Amino acid sequence: MSEVASVTDAQIEKFSLLYKERRKVQMMRFFGVTALTLISARLAFKGVASRKYIPTMFQLNHKPPPFSYKGEVVNALAYGTALSTGGFAMLGFGLCWIWDVSTLKELGNKLKELMGDGSEKDKLVSTNMDLDEDTQKVADALEAMLSTKK
């Protein structure tokens, strides 16, 4: 029971603050990428809408407006790259935010687990991870609390 008393509310609050800060960073990354994707989508839409040919009273309705082929290619490449990169970044950061993943190894393990890879060697198990002193105290205290309630 002395192990339970060794974990103070301040230590638990510290880990809670670290967790909240990590989740906030994940959220801000997702919303930042979302904002950039929406801005690039708006620019692409305006670029397409500005090229629409609307003839006036006595102009031909099938005459294409003059434009630069190089400029069109550069604009299309830039808009396409921005939209696809933004979409994939939103997918990646959104999954990391939803699954509470902080590292690429955690993300890889989560994806393997979802796809049915049953190998146990890559799973993150708390007994295999090196814990710092404060985390070890909290883990020991929680294990002691759970074992005394049986």
From Swiss-Prot:
Location in the cell: Membrane
Annotated TM spans: 28-45, 77-99
Predominant localisation class: membrane
GO cellular component: membrane; mitochondrion
Highest taxon, organism lineage: Eukaryota
Alphabetical keyword list: Membrane, Transmembrane, Transmembrane helix
The UniProt record lists the keyword Transmembrane: yes
Membrane topology according to the record: Multi-pass membrane protein
Family: Belongs to the AIM11 family.
Full protein name: Altered inheritance of mitochondria protein 11
Source organism of the structure: Kluyveromyces lactis (strain ATCC 8585 / CBS 2359 / DSM 70799 / NBRC 1267 / NRRL Y-1140 / WM37)
